Amino acid sequence: MPLLSQMQDQSGTTFAQLEALRQKLREYEYYYHVLDNPLVPDAEYDRLMNELKNLEWQHPEWITADSPTQRVGAKPLDGFAQVTHEIPMLSLDNAFSDEELDGFLRRMESYITEDPHTLAFCCEPKLDGLAVSILYVDGVLNQAATRGDGSTGEDITSNIRTIRNIPLKLNMDNPPARLEVRGEVFMPQKGFEALNERALEKGEKTFANPRNAAAGSLRQLDPKITRQRPLVLNAYGIGVYESDDELPVTHFERLQWLKSIGIPVNNEIRLATGREQLLAFYADIQAKRPTLGYDIDGAVLKVNDIGLQEQLGFISRSPRWAIAYKFPAQEEMTVLNDVEFQVGRTGAITPVAKLEPVFVAGVTVSNATLHNGDEIERLGIVIGDTVIIRRAGDVIPQIVGVVMERRPENAKKIEFPTACPVCESAVVRVEGEAVARCTGGLFCGAQRKEALKHFVSRKAMDIDGVGEKLIEQLMERELVHTPADLFKLEHTTLMRLERMGGKSAQNALNSIEKAKNTTLARFLFALGIRDVGEATAQNLANHFHNLDAIRAATFEQLQEVQDVGEVVANRIVRFWQEPHNVTVVEDLISQGIHWQDVVQVEIADNPLKGKSVVLTGTLTQLTRDQAKALLQSFGCKVSGSVSSKTDYLIAGEKAGSKLTKAQELGVKVLTEQEFIALTGEN
């Protein structure tokens, strides 16, 4: 029986390669959604996501709960209050060709009796901005939030209030009790250019593109700054709606209704019936793209009939009734001047193309990743080649081809290193893996640096006062060698570093001190054991409950943990067999890092285990997040919408349309008190 990580399909794709693809996508999502600092073009992300979807479709047994295909995006920043979306804000599936549009239409046939080719669609330009939710209570703007990860976003109410085309009060006499408007906030090109001109005059940093400018403006902690930015909203849909009056029964009519009550809607929205009209809209909006005055990157096509939308439903991260048909990414030619080789946390050697600077899709590009030796071979690329780079609203482009007829006579072959460019240890490539790795381990300065950066990262120990530049200084001066050394730093030591004043030094020490109180799962993830990601770390914590049990676990016992196979179990065992690792962990514990052991409570005859539960209304004894966490601890799936598959609706005060729908469907309704009694939390 082959190892799971060694299993491969007929094309030679292995599970390990699939998991590497997932990890790459997770990193790209974090930089795009959380840091507003994308690493790759949208086109490259979309291509990788499409590749992952296709592989998982071919191998459903390889799908894991933490796959990027099973969620929407990334978690919100900690600088803003968090808002839970009552109805998840899902993203859209993408199409990149007419054939993929045909596939989208064809997939509908399994869910509706109507011929998809005869359906009316509401067609909209795909705006390149930031998705937001704006809640009106009794006609007055009450709360606004970013999409975040689709379930939880950031509270940006104060900033949204500063956007001139968003009404603070709806233009109607009898407004709904609650109306959630969903739309895209973006920055028109003229406003973007003026913003950058002012920044240049003041000697300030400019924005790379309008999307980054819009995202940065919305996430200002000071609304006065946001008010000075030329932001605009275009609504594209409705979320929560509570009123005695019924909404229109088509998507197009709902948008026109929003427009009539003062909500801005895009002027290019059209109705189209059938494939040919959909393609005509796509071609038309693409032709208008240069003259619209704002950035778009495709066309959004939505089934117009709301009843059919409900029949079609959703998959894990997107609706079946809508698709984003994206434009081809913009391409330019430039020259490959050199290739540098970078060393990552696990020793992975990554070739980085150094390019003759070229202006592509609004940004000057001079670097591109070449991924690995296989990619260099596939492209047939050599130093001196003229290459085609593709970029779609991002900073780091993708090299998609070589212009062979322009190859110079003095072109130089790219030599993949056999020794680490940092520590000169041997470089090896394990059979079945695309990545070559430095064997130096923590002897390698590059791996130590990346390991420290991982240790302090948000999803690990979350030491936000210790960034990349500080780590580099600490290592250069040999003040820090292991993660445990961070907890031994003193104020006077930090004060001697460049650009480190008394306040900055104290902030760093405060962050380090705060990080001592963590969780077992975070600590395990922070250790950087290869292939032990967030989900695996959480599974280990849930299974063994404490660190001593994990350290003592045998190879066989580790494989009893969910999603831990032979390869991961072997890596965990080897980690604890290395005396240096044990010393570092014990040193960390001695510095005061602590957590509460995971306690698993088994409840006999648990009536909630495996049930689908929806929360609605205002809870008085628990917050919404507390109730959700409590339900999940009982093994429930907490959903944002009521359907025939819902087992329980927990109704707080002022429960609205969800309660009505639950009663119509015969879903069992619990009051907050009944719910608390059922869980034994009173």
From Swiss-Prot:
InterPro entries in the cross-refs: BRCT_dom (IPR001357), BRCT_dom_sf (IPR036420), DisA/LigA_HHH (IPR041663), DNA_ligase (IPR001679), DNA_ligase_AS (IPR018239), DNA_ligase_CS (IPR033136), DNAligase_adenylation (IPR013839), DNAligase_N (IPR013840)
EC numbers on record: 6.5.1.2
Swiss-Prot/TrEMBL catalytic activity: NAD(+) + (deoxyribonucleotide)n-3'-hydroxyl + 5'-phospho-(deoxyribonucleotide)m = (deoxyribonucleotide)n+m + AMP + beta-nicotinamide D-nucleotide
Pfam families from the UniProt entry: BRCT (PF00533), DNA_ligase_aden (PF01653), DNA_ligase_OB (PF03120), DNA_ligase_ZBD (PF03119), HHH_2 (PF12826), HHH_5 (PF14520), Nlig-Ia (PF22745)
Active site annotation, chain numbering: 126 (n6-amp-lysine intermediate)
Gene3D superfamilies: 5' to 3' exonuclease, C-terminal subdomain, 6.20.10.30, BRCT domain, DNA ligase/mRNA capping enzyme, Helix hairpin bin, Nucleic acid-binding proteins
Any GO BP annotation: DNA replication
Entry similarity comment: Belongs to the NAD-dependent DNA ligase family. LigA subfamily.
Protein name: DNA ligase
Organism per entry: Actinobacillus pleuropneumoniae serotype 7 (strain AP76)
Gene: ligA
